[in-house]
Amino acid sequence: MKEAKDARYTNGHLFTTISVSGMTMCYACNKSITAKEALICPTCNVTIHNRCKDTLANCTKVKQKQQKAALLKNNTALQSVSLRSKTTTRERPSSAIYPSDSFRQSLLGSRRGRSPLSLAKSVSTTNIAGHFNDESPLGLRRILSQSTDSLNMRNRTLSVESLIDEGAEVIYNELMSDFEMGEKDFAADSWSLAVDSSFLQQHKKEVMKQQDVIYELIQTELHHVRTLKIMTRLFRTGMLEELQLEPGVVQGLFPCVDELSDIHTRFLSQLLERRRQALCPGSPRNFVIHRLGDLLITQFSGPSADQMRKTYSEFCSRHTKALKLYKELYARDKRFQQFIRKVTRSAVLKRHGVQECILLVTQRITKYPVLISRILQHTHGIEEERQDLTTALGLVKELLSNVDQDVHELEKGARLQEIYNRMDPRAQTPVPGKGPFGREELLRRKLIHDGCLLWKTAAGRFKDVLMLLMTDVLVFLQEKDQKYIFPALDKPSVVSLQNLIVRDIANQEKGMFLISAAPPEMYEVHTASRDDRSTWIRVIQQSVRVCPSREDFPLIETEDEAYLRRIKMELQQKDRALVELLQEKVGLFAEMTHFQVEEDGGGGMPLPTLPRGLFRSESLESPRGERLLQDAIREVEGLKDLLVGPGVELLLTSREPALPVETDSGGNTSPGVTANGEARTFNGSIELCRADSDSSQKDRNGNQLRSPQEEALQRLVNLYGLLHGLQAAVAQQDTLMEARFPEGPERREKLTRANSRDGEAGRAGAAPVAPEKQATELALLQRQHALLQEELRRCRRLGEERATEAGSLEARLRESEQARALLEREVEEARRQLAALGHTEPLPAEAPWARRPLDPRRRSLPAGDALYLSFTPPQPSRGHDRLDLPVTIRSVHRPFEDRERQELGSPDERLQDSSDPDTGSEEEGSSSRLSPPHSPRDFTRMQDIPEETESRDGEPVASES
């Protein structure tokens, strides 16, 4: 019992088990508590889970009691210590144990502490100890050390109280000292109230409205800077220095406030400077700002826009966590609660608490589009200003859209990391044909959407699952013991978005079907509402449309594949850095040449421009290697023509010095002659002199032409840029080939020729295709070609198999036909023998009892039965011919009958040995011997009998008498 009781003590808490309702929340994890795992500490009145007791902080009331007891014990011990000599023993005043002003200043930093408990003299531990030496009792030393520790703790509490003593207004005034004039100038509510009434009446109504909006922009920017200053200088500094909070906790409360403060302070300074420039002479209040678009474009474009996007994205994405952390600190830490109350007690900061400041900073970026739109609405007459404001409005909207997108991605990334941390490390699910899918695969993808749904199983039951819509898959997770696992159901838990079809269930408002192609499965899931179902269908369809292919994004990636992917990404990053460096180098070279021309007196030469899209490998305007090389060759030829003259080979000019030639009658200057008629040579080459401004050339219209030096410098800059662009293109092409086609040099050689070759359409002015896009298309075409070749080979094999099978069937058919013909002939001969042996007189054909019914087995035979049923046998002649037919048949076949009896045996045995099913059995009797033919072949052979009869009609026949 003692051990069980001791186990209930955790961090000073005395926990007891209680019964609670289902709505009771845990103080530690903020989740609902069931009746079996509820614990309560009666000392501090905290209710938590049984599993959360180790994570709870120390009991506050127990800690306070211990501190009070220790302080009381220390005071008692100090009172019993004599620090003076025996003759002048007296009790030391209580003020002597308090810290000095210098010690408090070291804790308070630069603030001026004026606590009523401050001391005039300092005291140290050795001063308290007095005449004690090393032989003093150890217990007394311990008491003194504990007393100094308690003094430090009390000094920290007093430093917090000193913050309100010196006044939040004083601190606020110190923070806003840099913008003191701005605060006074923008104290009025609007521009109409800030300027003089006489000055106001001089302007139109549209100008008043425009200036009111500009005034509001500057005023709100000033208030925003004030909010940031309060967050940085007042709250954050106080938490770090006064409360001694961890820097990570304070950074979680106020992320990126320094960067935001710098951005908006710089922008506010520019606005105030523009306002100062717009002041009317002799008046510190009256101003009209006519141009503001240029400042807005500078603020919301370029590096400033990139910095704003980065800082606001991070701040807004951590907005929810910051508020949650603030509420937790305010609920748990009494010192933090006291600090916030004292700081916000003043009238200046009453509406600027921590939560209000965080919300104001988050909403600030959304105010710019509204203000700029209103300024543009009331701006008339200045077209350039309207264009600048329109451009600035577009830039602000683009910035806001990018920030929203970044915030959404960061929030989804944080949500994905949270899910990953809660997943069971051993959780895996098999993917058909791919292998196990573990939780590491989640971090490779981006989370697009997630939510709790009901999965209807094959048995008709509903399972609570968490569905994650990611880059290329749908993942189903199930919560078990506060951990996420893959549900063990009858269908895979990972569904590929490749060719995924999503359909709503017609008779249900919340249900939808997910039809997967690989493997072919159909999932039925149900959302919480109809709106949730519509949202899921919309985001799934959008993700299916942009789903990457399996070649670019495999479903499951091994460690080697991940390593190769990282290397490829690093190579691409290095290529981009190389391109940026080359572009910067070419720009510096162009500026250098421009500066040299200006020093030489050619100030009219514009800055050389570089080809647009020269270093942009992602754009469609990026030239390929062969085009860059051809352009560079043309620039070299043009430079050669400019230096040595057209029509002169560069090889000759490098070997033989050019001679000065006089100007011809047509006014053309020959090689070696300068523009002013002077020829200068140096080491066999012609030196190009600088043309004077008075002797500059002009065209027929009188326009100023470029001097030869300017033309040469322009071509030199172009050549420099083209060569570096060629270097960048070659580097990117090499990386592309090594990354995409590592299987052999032949394929890389083909790709090189394809990428460097410009078609006729490109030369005609069509936009060239990017190398990476061309390589992707080439790989796709090669893959399609391989698939078509394989399909063609498969079709050929199938055709050969079908032809072989058809040949074998045809051979079997011929064999069966031959066997059947042989059997039919034998059966016919047997029937003739039976007819000759069994009946001396034939039966009348018209006798109904002589007709044998059709064998049922013949009904299954093919067209032979139809011919048999439609055949009408020839009718024998009346009277005498009717009796002569069987006699003729009998006389004709008697020799054959005798021979058959001797060699083949009885006809019955011959019929039994036959394999033909129509030859019958012994049970059919004599009627089977007169059965008609069952096939057309039998009919054609039976026609010979009447012919033989007719051929013997001329012979004399003996009468019966």
Swiss-Prot record:
Zinc finger (Phorbol-ester/DAG-type) in chain: 12-59
Domain DH residue range list: 209-406
Domain PH: 446-545
Annotated organism of origin: Sus scrofa (Pig)
Annotated Pfam families: PH_16, RhoGEF
Domain description: The DH (DBL-homology) domain promotes tyrosine phosphorylation of RIPK2. The DH (DBL-homology) domain interacts with and promotes loading of GTP on RhoA. The PH domain has no affinity for phosphoinositides suggesting that it does not interact directly with membranes.
Protein name: Rho guanine nucleotide exchange factor 2
Sequence positions bearing N6-acetyllysine: 327
Subunit composition and interactions: Found in a complex composed at least of ARHGEF2, NOD2 and RIPK2. Interacts with RIPK2; the interaction mediates tyrosine phosphorylation of RIPK2 by Src kinase CSK. Interacts with RIPK1 and RIPK3. Interacts with YWHAZ/14-3-3 zeta; when phosphorylated at Ser-860. Interacts with the kinases PAK4, AURKA and MAPK1. Interacts with RHOA and RAC1. Interacts with NOD1. Interacts (via the N- terminal zinc finger) with CAPN6 (via domain II). Interacts with DYNLT1.
GO BP terms, alphabetized: actin filament organization; asymmetric neuroblast division; cell morphogenesis; cellular response to muramyl dipeptide; innate immune response; negative regulation of microtubule depolymerization; positive regulation of epidermal growth factor receptor signaling pathway; positive regulation of ERK1 and ERK2 cascade
Region called Interaction with DYNLT1, residue ranges: 104-134
Coiled coil: 561-588, 772-841
UniProt main location, coarse: cytoplasm
